[in-house]
Design a protein with these regions (language model features):
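RecA-like P-loop NTPase motor core of helicase/translocase proteins
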Residues: 1-240
Length: 240
């Protein structure tokens, strides 16, 4: 049981670490001339604040790395802090997907109806899923690659093809354990997971897991030799 959860934490990185990873790789002669690295360098910023900028970072990471995992079947989840944030993220993802001619679709999950700038938003009118399929059923389709959630599917959601999680929400205690564990389901040829956290600190996540597990991978300072190993897992340079 421990190892099952530790696999989740093995490839957990905070956004500042991800930023340093890209910066370090870009300065390395082995990678600096690679086109995909130049694209990632363009979008990665030290302190991204706007939804537009964070969407660009996540989407370009997904298209440069995650999409090729699990025999090109891998999916991602974005955990947002509120229904409003989820409603704002969904059209921005869709806009950038269309702008870049990426052949993927997104889904958004939140409860009830939210009013924003005089308009009412629901899962139904934002997702426009054909037929009577649920979000869980639709997400199993190959076209739907990214699921944006607000206080939904953070517990009890079982999707083996979920490889990457982007976290833009404060997490603590058992909620952190339950949320991050969404990516730990086993699937054929699924050999890794990845969590990029924009909000929480490494120490906070370690503390959340400690009451339940005797050890974690989130200890000590960043070892850049390990980061290079992680980089090989994160980036597949033949995409662009």
């Amino acid at each position: 049981k421990e190892g099952f959860i530790l696999d989740v934490l093995e490839y957990y990185i905070t956004y500042p670490t991800y930023f340093k990873l890209v910066q370090t790789a870009y300065e390395d002669n082995s990678y600096s001339k690679d086109k995909s690295m130049k694209v990632l360098k363009k979008y990665v910023e030290q302190h991204p604040h706007s939804i537009k900028k964070k969407t660009a970072i996540m989407l370009n990471h997904f298209m440069s790395s995650t999409i090729k995992k699990i025999d090109n079947k891998a999916k991602a989840m974005l955990v947002t802090s509120s229904r409003k944030e989820a409603v704002l993220y969904k059209p921005e993802f869709d806009r950038q997907i269309k702008e870049n001619n990426f052949n993927i679709k997104t889904l958004v999950a939140f409860t009830s109806t939210i009013k924003l700038d005089g308009l009412e938003y629901t899962e139904s009118n934002m997702n426009k899923i054909e037929g009577k399929k649920s979000i869980k059923e639709a997400f199993k389709e190959d076209a739907f690659k990214i699921l944006i959630v607000a206080n939904k599917f953070q517990t009890g959601f079982d999707e083996p093809l979920l490889h990457t999680m982007y976290v833009d929400k404060k997490l603590s205690g058992v909620a952190a354990v339950q949320t991050l564990s969404r990516v730990n389901r086993i699937a054929p040829n699924k050999t890794s997971t990845l969590i990029i956290d924009f909000v929480n600190k490494k120490e906070e996540i370690r503390e959340a897991f400690e009451p339940y597990y005797t050890e974690t991978y989130l200890t000590g300072k960043t070892d850049y030799h390990k980061l290079y190993d992680l980089m090989e897992n994160i980036y597949d340079f033949d995409l662009f």
